[in-house]
Amino acid sequence: MSDFYQDFNKRRTFAIISHPDAGKTTVTEKLLLFGGAIQLAGTVKGRKADRHATSDWMEMEKERGISITTSVMQFIHNQHVINLLDTPGHEDFSEDTYRTLTAVDSALMVIDVAKGVEERTVKLMEVCRLRDTPIMTFINKLDREGREPIDLLDEVESVLGIQCAPITWPVGMGKRFKGIYHRYQDIIYLYQQGSNAKKVEAMQIKGLDNPQLDELIGDSADELREEIELVKGASHGFNLEDYLAGKMTPVYFGSAINNFGIKELLDDFVEYAPGPQPRATQERVVSPNEETFSGFVFKIQANMDPKHRDRIAFLRVCSGAYKKGMKLSHLRIGKEVQISNALTFMAGDRSHTELALAGDIIGLHNHGTIRIGDTFTQGEQLKFTGIPNFAPELFRLVRLRDPLKSKALLKGLIELSEEGATQVFRPLNSNQLILGAVGILQFDVVAHRLKHEYKVDCIYESVNVTCARWVYSEDDKAMSEFRTKAYDYLALDGGDMLMYLAPTKVNLTMAEERYPKIKFCATREH
């Protein structure tokens, strides 16, 4: 095994964030292509094409061409182990994305050159801000006409409140796109429309004043020289400390679909991006160089392999090393478990791993005992913090077409809710099942997966619930009285936590006023 593979400092764990359709999944594919993880990149738009993007592997994603769940992929580049977490671009899956951002050390933001900063990017950036996550930026689709690069940098700075340091700079765009200039290497990489699926080495010209540049790109050479002078005066120089503190984003330009500008980004990413960072627990801060193992579960995915009807818990290793066959304490349930078959991932492909270090993501087989937010250690009582659970904003009543399938329905809903993509509520006063979600597409996903993976066909009806809140109280007497008086509005969620289901916002406000000793919470930590 290579030396670098056994060094946690050589780990780079990051997520890609963007607005839908900025080209995030294509960028993911091309990073894997240049990282040597795949030989041929699939393309995302060819919905019916034979070759699908490696990271979009769930049936429904293949049909719709959108990334719904977070994929985890590991590959090696320049003697570093890179763990790439692809997040759903679709806004209905924000919870999955928020939780994924708790498991990474840095992020890559993808922006469409024609559209600039979009709403979803703003929201994701806010989440990164909470943790001061270092962010690199890739401005994509330079092979099409778009906005002026300098205007885009201004927009990123003003809307997202982060300084931009352009590392590469485009030579033209659209039909006039000739390549990119790397400001710190003083090299021009000439654009050639790469075969979409294979990597091609770009032709390089050393030096902005090289006469060869004028021969090859004509008038564009002088335009580039003028622009670079302007950029020097109008933009920030790259400062590594500011980037690592989340105050500055290095910016790269390119065309992911044509494999252009990605390699330069990847080379710099490996050099600049942070390795595994310390993590907060309720008890203390855990450092990645500690010898004993610790980690937390940030995602659960059911049926990654329909042939095996299994569930996998994705665990971020925070310290120490996982070694095959080791015993770990599953702290929430107070049990020691032996783990001999942890997995690593290349999107839908998985293989058993012998070793995982801080920064790595491993998959644990889950037979219903592991939940999002669970901590695993070698015995020390720790609870990692900051893994959010959001109260849903949309609700549906679920009815079975075949009443004999009620057992399968409950099993399916509980398993799907354990993934955190949807929530299931059982009202105390009836046998009904109510589904809650943050976005409308989640209901489609649940319906599709219940039908195909659990063979349960349901009818989904509107229900008289507008908002839900977790309810707690430190005063047992007040809680007991509240349970009696508000009985008709109470339900249990998939984890048996008590929730208040309010038919209207006014009803919720009145309940909060009437029961001052009860806390009504829109989020809770896992």
Curated annotation (Swiss-Prot):
Q: Which CDD domains match?
A: RF3, RF3_II, RF3_III
Task: List membrane-spanning regions.
Answer: none
**What are the BP-aspect GO terms?**
regulation of translational termination
> Which domain of life does the UniProt lineage start with?
Bacteria
Task: Write out the annotated subcellular location.
Answer: Cytoplasm
The record ties this protein, via PROSITE patterns, to: G_TR_1, G_TR_2
| Entry-linked InterPro entries | EF-G-like_DII, EFG_III/V, G_TR_CS, P-loop_NTPase, PrfC, RF3_C, RF3_dom_3_sf, RF3_GTP-bd
Coiled coil (residue ranges): none
List, alphabetically, the GO terms of the cellular component aspect: cytosol
Where GTP binds, per the record, is at: 18-25, 86-90, 140-143
Which part of the chain is the tr-type G domain? 9-277
- Keyword annotations of the record: Cytoplasm, GTP-binding, Nucleotide-binding, Protein biosynthesis
> One MF term from GO for this chain?
GTP binding
Q: Which NCBIfam families match?
A: prfC (TIGR00503), PRK00741.1 (NF001964), small_GTP (TIGR00231)
Instruction: Relate the protein's function as given in its record.
Output: Increases the formation of ribosomal termination complexes and stimulates activities of RF-1 and RF-2. It binds guanine nucleotides and has strong preference for UGA stop codons. It may interact directly with the ribosome. The stimulation of RF-1 and RF-2 is significantly reduced by GTP and GDP, but not by GMP.
What family does this chain come from, according to its entry?
Belongs to the TRAFAC class translation factor GTPase superfamily. Classic translation factor GTPase family. PrfC subfamily.
Question: What is this protein called in UniProt?
Answer: Peptide chain release factor 3
Q: Which organism is it from?
A: Legionella pneumophila (strain Corby)
What would be the name of the gene that encodes this protein? prfC
